Amino acid sequence: MKKELEELNGFKDLRIVDNFYQTSSFFPMPTTEIGTLSESGLTNLGSYSLCFPYYIAGKDYYAMILCCRNSSNTAKNILRTGKCTINFITDKRKYFKEAVRLGYPGETTEEKMKDCIFNLVDGKRARENPNEQYPKIIQEAFQVFECTWVRELDGAENDKVQDEYLPPYHQFNGITSQFGAHFLSLIHIS
C-alpha cells in the first residue's frame, strides 16, 4: 500500500548513502568548494554544503560558519593556517560531478587535485599581499569569499591538528566534538 501511495504521489524511495546531502537530498543548499592550504602549500578543495552566514549585521565584520569533520583535510588545514576560501560553484553538471569527486574523503591533496577540472587563480588577498601565501580561488566560481578563521572566539586559539580529539570541546568554534569542527571565519570584503 505504501509503495502504491508513493508511486501515486510521484515520490520515490531513495536509499540514503554517505554524503546524503549531496547525493540523495534535494533541499536547497549551496554547493561550495572550500579552498585551504596543504602542508606543502598546495590549494586543497573540499566540497561542502554545511556553510552558513553567522554574523550578518551589528558587528564590525561579517562571518560564515563551516561545519566539517575534524579529521578532514579542510579542518586540518584551517587549524594550521587559519585561512580558507569559500567558492560558490554554478549548477553545471560537470561541476557537480567534480564536487562529488572532490568531496570524497581519504585522499591527499596531491592525489585529489591532480585531475581537478577547476582553474585555480590567485585571489585578491594574494595579489594585495604577495609575501604571504593564501589558498587559490576557483576562476569558474560565481562568488568567492576569502576568509580568516577567528581563532579567538570560544577559546579555540589553542586548537591544533591531532590524531584524536578528547573533551573538553568548544561550544561553537574550533573542535566541537569527538569527530566535528566548526570554523567561524571572517569574510574579507573590500
Where are these regions (language model features)?
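Active-site-proximal mixed secondary-structure blocks
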Residues: 1-47, 52-190
